Amino acid sequence: MDTLSYKTISANKATVTKEWVIVDATDQTLGRLGAKVAKLLRGKYKPNFTPHVDCGDNVIIINADKVKLTGNKWNDRVYLSYTGYPGGQREMTPARLIAKPNGEERLLKKVVKGMLPKNILGAKLLNNLYVYACLLYTSPSPRDGATSRMPSSA
C-alpha cells in the first residue's frame, strides 16, 4: 500500500479555480439568500475547500431591489452601528436603508458580510461579491478558463 497517495492536499492560491456565479434575488428571502451567497463566496461546497484560502467563487447578485423579508421585518429589524464617539450608536432599519442611494446593494452586502468570517480573509472574500439592484449590470468579465453558471440551489 502506497502511503503517499493518502496525503491530504491543501488548496492554495495557484491551484484554486474561481468561477463566476450569477444569482437572481427576485422573491428570495434575504437571510436565506445571504447564507447561500456566503457559502458560494467561501467555497465550502468544493471538494478541495481549505479554511485559510480564498477558494470560493465570484458572485454577482442581480435584482437586489426585489428581495423580500417576511413578517414586518422591513420596519422592526434594526441594524446597529457605532461611530466610536460617546452617544454615537446609530440605528438603521432595512426600509430606511433601502431608501438611501445604493441601499439595496448596501443591505445585501451587510447581510452577507455578517455571515462571513470576521477576519482578513472575510474582508477579501467580500471583494468577490458584486450586487446590482436591477437586471442590467456592468461587471468585470470572467477571465479565460472561468465559466459563468447559475446554481440550482441559489
Can you say where each PLM-predicted feature lies in the sequence?
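Ribosome large-subunit tunnel/peptidyl-transferase-proximal elements
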Residues: 2-84, 89-106
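Conserved small/polar residues in nucleotide/adenosyl-binding loops
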Residues: 137-142
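Hydrophobic alpha-helical segments, chiefly the membrane-spanning helices
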Residues: 150-154
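Polyanion-binding loop/helix "lid" in catalytic or ligand-binding cores
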Residues: 104-115
